[in-house]
Amino acid sequence: MEYLSAFNPNGLLRSVSTVSSELSRRVWNSAPPPQRPFRVCDHKRTVRKGLTAASLQELLDKVLETLLLRGVLTLVLEEDGTAVDSEDFFQLLEDDTCLMVLEQGQSWSPKSGMLSYGLGREKPKHSKDIARITFDVYKQNPRDLFGSLNVKATFYGLYSMSCDFQGVGPKRVLRELLRWTSSLLQGLGHMLLGISSTLRHVVEGADRWQWHGQRHLHS
């Protein structure tokens, strides 16, 4: 009876709740993070690969394997060369972020022909970005005649949007060119018919006016 009287149902419920919370936390923490897509290029921007990874180390491992590189690698943002050297910063990157991989001794450089801020002048120290627009031209298929274009706009450093214009192959380009040529020739034909009809009416009108003039003279 003393054992039963010492039994506290509230304490048992608290213990069960604590164990359940601990199990839920462990299950949640053990769940692997989701795979996210990234675009990685070499320091010359001649090789570009699309890779998925859940962590910075996993992405570095895949870059080593895919690009056949060796040694210590460094990942930086392709647009401005910001180093991606911590897991916390990596997790803050958006999907489809363009990254550049650098081997030992290599350094980031801007794209050739890229327009700089203020026509080459340095950006004022106390200025604030309103919008930043980046253009990325790439090929998904070596047979594509024109590369695909990715346009990414960031407003006030908070809101961003991107749009992909997919490239097309030679057959589709030829098809579109023939279609536009056909439409152009058809429109040109209608225009020539209209001009011909107008000239005919002008000539017939002139003949009629000349005939009426001669008739008045004879009368």
From Swiss-Prot:
Transmembrane segments: none
A Gene Ontology cellular-component term: lipid droplet
InterPro entries in the record: CIDE-N_dom (IPR003508)
Modified residues (Phosphothreonine): 18
GO BP annotations listed: apoptotic process; COPII-coated vesicle cargo loading; execution phase of apoptosis; lipid droplet fusion; lipid storage; positive regulation of apoptotic process; regulation of triglyceride metabolic process; very-low-density lipoprotein particle assembly
Compartments (UniProt record): Lipid droplet; Endoplasmic reticulum membrane; Golgi apparatus; Cytoplasmic vesicle, COPI-coated vesicle
Tissue note: Highly enriched in the liver.
Assigned keywords, A-Z: Apoptosis, Cytoplasmic vesicle, Endoplasmic reticulum, Golgi apparatus, Lipid droplet, Membrane, Phosphoprotein
Phenotypic effect of disruption: Mice display lower levels of plasma triglycerides and free fatty acids and show smaller lipid droplets in hepatocytes. Mice are resistant to high-fat diet-induced obesity and are protected against hepatic steatosis. Mice also show decreased very-low-density lipoprotein (VLDL)-triacylglycerol secretion and reduced VLDL size.
Main location: other
Topology relative to the membrane: Peripheral membrane protein
UniProt-listed CDD domains: CIDE_N_B
Gene Ontology MF terms in the entry: identical protein binding; lipid transfer activity; molecular adaptor activity; phosphatidic acid binding
CIDE-N domain location: 34-110
Effect noted on mutating residue 128 to A: Abolished interaction with PREB
Main function: Lipid transferase specifically expressed in hepatocytes, which promotes unilocular lipid droplet formation by mediating lipid droplet fusion. Lipid droplet fusion promotes their enlargement, restricting lipolysis and favoring lipid storage. Localizes on the lipid droplet surface, at focal contact sites between lipid droplets, and mediates atypical lipid droplet fusion by promoting directional net neutral lipid transfer from the smaller to larger lipid droplets. The transfer direction may be driven by the internal pressure difference between the contacting lipid droplet pair.
Homology family: Belongs to the CIDE family.
Subunit and partners: Interacts with DFFA. Interacts with DFFB; inhibited by DFFB. Interacts with APOB. Interacts with PREB/SEC12; facilitating loading of SCAP-SREBP into COPII vesicles.
The protein's name: Lipid transferase CIDEB
